[in-house]
UniProtKB/Swiss-Prot annotation:
Function field: Catalyzes the reversible cyclization of carbamoyl aspartate to dihydroorotate.
Record bears the keyword Protein biosynthesis: no
Catalytic activity: (S)-dihydroorotate + H2O = N-carbamoyl-L-aspartate + H(+)
Keyword hit for Nucleotide-binding: no
Residues reported in the UniProt entry to bind Zn(2+) 2: 103, 140, 178
Residues the record lists as binding Zn(2+) 1: 17, 19, 103, 251
Binding-site positions, substrate: 19-21, 45, 140, 223, 255, 267
UniProt similarity note: Belongs to the metallo-dependent hydrolases superfamily. DHOase family. Class II DHOase subfamily.
One Gene Ontology biological process: 'de novo' pyrimidine nucleobase biosynthetic process
Annotated positions of the N6-carboxylysine modification: 103
Protein name per Swiss-Prot or TrEMBL: Dihydroorotase
PANTHER family per UniProt: DIHYDROOROTASE (PTHR43137:SF1)
């Protein structure tokens, strides 16, 4: 039996899917990502959503202002796709280095997605332009039809929306974000160089039993929702394979405690404070530490065509306890982070 490693040194990671929010929330959460990651793909679902180059540029400035001066961090901005979006706006933003990618939210699929796309036909000209210029499309892959069970919405999306979309635009770079099912994992594994996926720490660590058995755990509630253990295992198998088109995307999505612990709670897991330790825990459990650095730090830049980060991050085998809560602003609001109060064996050393 080989000795357990006592430390892990990896190239600085990137987070290819985060929600930073705005205002006091942005100021509270941004440092948890910027101290660990070199870059992050920032979701555009603000109110109002980020649909123009000017709005993305202004939001980027607010993010940079919220990042501590000592952190070397670059926010990568995205455009929120809407039915009426002008392809020229997308291309201008991409050419100017403001937009790194565009985000497809089916209307009403998740938080602040009311302005989302109602049909692929309505954005066909935008997708055609994105395919031409090599701009990635990031997809929240769930159908939103009321009669489709919430646990089936990702698999149905692949069948009825994603596969036809990729047939229509075969060279469009597509990232299936926060995949949660064996169908999605298999679809990416069977795909070509134009298809990739991000996977969150919560979907690797947990399944729906953890959220629902013995009491409802609202801080595990996110969209897409946690699925059966067979789907969790399929995700673990996918990352254990070392396949280069799966990479780190936390979907960290902060909501204050009062908006989570309520009769109609918000969807989202705030995992930025514990994410790298959580991923390391999973990769060790499944015997895949040999692929940990590639998943965190190499596969994403490889798909996006961006340079690798030059500096390193170190994790040591030293138990630490995730904070029970994190303060937001000066009004007594707080966040409950992913794995709050839990002890993890891998600790990031900065």
């Amino acid at each position: 039996m080989t000795d357990q490693p006592q430390q892990l040194t990896i190239r600085r990671p990137d987070d290819w899917h985060i929600h930073l929010r705005d205002g006091e929330m942005l100021e509270a959460v941004a440092p948890f990502t910027s101290e660990i990651c070199g870059r992050a793909i920032v979701m555009p679902n603000l109110v109002p959503p980020v649909t123009s180059v000017a709005a993305a540029r202004a939001y980027r400035e607010r993010i940079v202002a919220a990042v501590p001066a000592a952190h070397d961090f670059t926010p990568l901005m995205t455009c929120y796709l809407t039915d009426g979006l002008d392809p020229d706006e997308i291309e201008a933003g991409f050419a100017e280095g403001v937009f790194t990618a565009a985000k497809l939210y089916p209307a009403h699929a998740t938080t602040n997605s009311a302005h989302g796309v109602t049909s692929i036909a309505s954005i066909a000209k935008v997708l055609e332009r994105m395919q031409k210029i090599g701009m990635p499309l990031l997809i929240h892959g769930e159908v939103t039809d009321a009669h489709i069970d919430i646990f089936d919405r990702e698999a149905r999306f692949i069948e009825t929306v994603l596969h036809p979309l990729r047939q229509q635009f075969p060279e469009l770079k597509v990232v299936c974000e926060h995949i949660t099912t064996q169908e999605a994992a298999a679809y990416v594994l069977e795909g070509n160089q134009y298809l990739a996926a991000t996977i969150t720490p919560q979907h690797l660590m947990f399944n729906r039993n953890h959220m629902l058995v013995g009491g409802i755990r609202p801080h595990l509630y996110c969209l897409p929702i946690l699925k059966r253990n067979i789907h969790q295992q399929a995700l673990r198998d996918a990352v254990a394979s070392g396949h280069r088109r799966f990479f780190l995307g936390t979907d960290t999505a902060p909501h204050t405690r009062d908006r989570k612990e309520t009769s109609c709670g918000c969807a989202g897991v705030f995992n930025a404070p514990s994410m790298l330790s959580a991923y390391a825990t999973v990769f060790e459990e499944i015997g895949a530490l040999a692929h940990f650095e590639a998943f965190c730090s190499e596969n994403g830049p490889g798909f996006y065509g961006l340079p690798l980060n030059e500096d390193k991050v170190r994790l040591i085998r030293q138990p630490w306890t995730v904070p029970e809560s994190i303060r937001v602003g000066g009004n007594g609001d707080n966040l409950v982070p992913f794995l709050a109060g839990e002890t993890l064996n891998w600790q990031v050393v900065l």
